[in-house]
């Protein structure tokens, strides 16, 4: 049964990584919509209104990321993964909470850490997914062979 949960864990990890790609797409769409506005009041106002669509998708998708991270953490128990891996999943959940708080601080310099924390979330999720991949063949680690003593010159 744990084998099925390991596969589910791998699938959820890939879904999380796909969600992160969407997050980056949505936020970039919002930023570049604003950045490409002409330097007049009407154009800037229109750009902000158009960027709202991307920002709203970024916020909604952020909630989906949170749900998947909670599922990822719960599945790590069901898959009977090592304690270290479960601990790293707990860290991932903690980083998500920090991510949510950073997005709502109201202090621009502090909220800027939101982007850096996102990179840490992406890296940790990629590590956990790759390290615990349940599909395909795993290559056994190289075994140490006892070397023969080198012949001595005569």
Briefly describe each language-model feature range.
Residues 1-154:
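Polytopic transmembrane helical bundles with strong interfacial aromatic enrichment
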